[in-house]
Regions:
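Residue-level detector of short, conserved catalytic/binding motifs and their immediate flanks
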Residues: 217-219, 231, 248, 270
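A short beta-strand-loop-beta hairpin characteristic of the jelly-roll/cupin
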Residues: 223-245
Length: 293
């Protein structure tokens, strides 16, 4: 399939986009791409590269079995939408008694792989959390309880890593350098990813991703079941969107404003975003043997 290339100007100012963080956008009037395409801004910086049907039905089914990671919870600040009362509210942790700043909105989103902290909303996952010699990262809860499913999908993760390298080699090279600074036990084997965010029928509001490698790139694939329409990945500032469906791959600059259009129908759309948690370079640095220095 031939790949088209487009250069797109900004339709909205940066100030306009910042004011609309956490708001939902419609796909009405926006150009939706449904076939292979590379899209750049006017400075030549890649916004996204989209490829159809890169995963086999069997690979999609393997990923789909991880959909349980996307539990209903309060974990995505701007992406879940910002209500009039604001992103956060205060609660008292039942386990620590501390005052916590938590989200006001819920979404079906979770994580697979590894995370850059031992705690999650006030709950400690390691009794040695205060030990300065212990790594400050952990296997995610879902990965730990579904280890065989995770291992079964490693070849798919590694294939996605390979496509990342082929599509955006410059960003891949920078992310590879960054992951070389992280303890290998917290890296998804034979990839330059530490973490996968799993979203289930999640219409995200306008946001930029945070916590990932700033010089890298986001890698999104979709595994779905049943029929649905919409759910486009929108880039409102540039007035275009991508219809990423079952087996498709979208390499994207996740630090560009983006969101999703409304999803209609009774089908299930699971999106998987592969990335590197930048904080791990400090919390879980690569262990260097003094004999190697």
């Amino acid at each position: 399939m031939q790949t088209e290339t487009f250069v797109v100007p900004k339709f909205y100012t940066d100030e306009f986009m910042e004011k609309h963080e956490g708001k939902f956008f419609s796909s009405k009037g926006i150009k939706i791409f449904k076939d292979n395409v590379d899209i750049f801004d006017e400075q030549g910086k890649p916004i996204c590269k989209f490829r159809k049907n890169v995963l086999t039905p069997e690979e999609c089914q393997c990923l789909f079995q991880l959909n349980g990671a996307a539990k209903l919870g309060k974990t995505r600040p701007s992406a879940s939408g910002i209500p009039p009362e604001g992103k956060y509210k205060y609660i008292i942790s039942k386990s620590t008694g501390k005052k916590l700043h938590v989200l006001t909105t819920q979404s079906r989103s979770g994580i697979v792989g590894f995370w850059d902290t031992l705690s999650n909303f006030g709950h400690k996952h390691d009794k040695h959390a205060k030990d300065s010699k212990k790594p400050k990262c952990r296997t995610t809860a879902y990965t730990g309880t579904h280890l065989e499913q995770y291992k079964d999908c490693l070849p798919v993760f590694q294939k996605i890593n390979k496509i990342f390298k082929e599509l955006v080699p410059k960003q891949y090279s920078k992310q590879k350098k960054a992951i070389g600074l992280i303890d290998s036990q917290f890296i998804i084997p034979k990839t330059i990813f530490t973490t996968v965010t799993v979203n289930k029928n999640f219409r995200t509001a306008l946001h930029k991703d945070s916590g990932d490698c700033k010089e890298g790139f986001g890698n999104l694939v979709v595994a779905s079941c049943g029929n649905y329409t919409g759910g486009y990945t929108l880039f409102p500032q540039y007035q275009f969107g991508i219809d990423c469906r079952n087996g498709d791959f979208l390499a994207m600059d996740v630090h560009t404003w983006h969101c999703n259009s409304e999803l209609n129908g009774d089908g299930t759309r699971i999106s998987f975003v592969f990335y590197l948690r930048e904080k791990m370079q400090k919390t879980c640095p690569k262990q260097v043997n003094v004999l190697d220095q």
